[in-house]
């Protein structure tokens, strides 16, 4: 878990490692093994001065920004040899053809569109070979609007799923009626006639948002034996007592910011 800038010990992450290890041990000696690829690296937050500047960010991220690094790693480890990979990442990092909007005074219409997230970089090189599939989730609302989170497609997607008894299902968005559902979330800022198909290629509905829960946190992962290692890896590990005080708050946390970084 310390091979990335992991802030918290997520039980499900460790269960994935355990399942892959168990599966690989069951295979014949020469069989191709199930592989888990860590697409990031240790950041050096000890070099952070409290204010983000080009100079200290070069120190914090010595191998480059996360998007470029991840793109290069996937190319070297997977795409260069013609293999395929399923990448699980935060939603903005997964955008491919869609360009995430920011308010920007100097841009036309006061909106600047990000084209350098991981998915964007891969899509610019490999086109339709790279697809973005969303897991059902709340969308961030427009700036200065409440509530902070919205049900996708103005709630119509969940209404349709409700008529189907909320059974888990995956479906295409491109060229389908569900993909034509209008959306007025933050993602639509700067776009005209914005629909779900303008965001992703496909969608996986697991259950209504009201029934979703966050990952499980291993409260015993951090102890006096490894807290020093954690402090060196991540800025937010200030002490064992601080970590333990923050876990309950994080356990209830929902994504509310439309512009995550790092």
What are these regions (language model features)?
Residues 1-110, 118:
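A substrate-binding/cap region within the structured catalytic cores of diverse enzymes
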Residues 56-71, 99-104, 108-254:
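Extracellular hydrolytic enzyme modules, especially secreted metalloproteases
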Residues 255-262:
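Conserved small/polar residues in nucleotide/adenosyl-binding loops
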């Amino acid at each position: 878990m310390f091979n990335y800038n992991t802030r918290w010990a997520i039980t499900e992450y460790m269960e994935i490692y355990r399942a892959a290890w168990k599966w690989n041990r069951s295979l014949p000696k020469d069989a191709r093994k199930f592989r888990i690829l860590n697409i990031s690296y240790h950041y050096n937050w000890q070099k952070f001065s409290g204010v983000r500047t080009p100079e200290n960010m070069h120190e914090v991220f010595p191998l480059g920004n996360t998007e470029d690094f991840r793109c290069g790693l996937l190319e070297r480890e997977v795409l260069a040899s013609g293999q395929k990979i399923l990448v699980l990442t935060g939603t903005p990092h997964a955008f491919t053809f869609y360009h995430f909007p920011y308010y920007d005074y100097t841009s036309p219409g006061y909106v600047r569109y990000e084209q350098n997230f991981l998915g964007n970089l891969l899509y610019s090189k490999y086109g339709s070979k790279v697809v973005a599939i969303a897991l059902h989730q709340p969308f961030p609302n427009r700036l200065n609007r409440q509530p902070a989170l919205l049900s996708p497609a103005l709630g119509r997607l969940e209404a349709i799923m409700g008529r189907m008894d909320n059974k888990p299902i995956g479906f295409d968005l491109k060229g389908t009626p569900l993909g034509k559902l209008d959306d007025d979330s933050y993602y639509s800022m700067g776009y005209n006639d914005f629909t779900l198909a303008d965001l992703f290629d496909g969608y996986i509905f697991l259950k209504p948002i009201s029934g979703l829960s966050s990952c499980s946190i291993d409260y015993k992962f951090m102890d006096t034996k490894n807290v020093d290692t954690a402090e060196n890896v991540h800025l937010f590990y200030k002490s064992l007592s601080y970590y333990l005080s923050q876990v309950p708050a994080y356990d209830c946390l929902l994504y509310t910011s439309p512009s995550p970084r790092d």
